[in-house]
C-alpha cells in the first residue's frame, strides 16, 4: 500500500465515522442485494441497491440542472478530501454504490469533459491500483 492509498484509507474511515450522511448511507449498503454469474471467462456481478432510486430518478432536464448548484463547488462542511496532483480532490462519495466509493472532481469548477484528463485518469488508476475507475460525465 502506497502513501496515497493509506491516506485514502484513513479518509474513508474518518468520513464514515464522523460524517453523519456518509455513515448512514454506507450503513444502508447492507440492504444491497448481489448476485454472481460465473462462466468460463469471467464473473459478472449484478447489484440491486434500493437507495439508488434517489439519484436514478433525479430530474436531469436542462432547467433542473441549471437550477441545481454544483455539488462539488458547494460541498458540505463535513466533507473532507485528499488533494491529488494539485488539480483534483479525492472525496468519499456520500451516496455510495460500493463499500469504498470515491469521487475525484477537479479542484475548480469546469464543464465536465474527459478528453483533457485521460492521462490524469491513467495516473489515478496507477496510483490507486486497488480501485476501479469509471467516468460519470
List the model feature ranges, each with a label:
Residues 1-116, 128-131:
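Active-site microenvironments that recognize anionic phosphate/pyrophosphate groups
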Residues 120-122:
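A gly/proline- and charged-residue-enriched helix-loop-helix capping module
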Residues 131-137:
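A short glycine-rich, hydrophobically flanked beta-strand micro-motif that places a catalytic Asp/Glu
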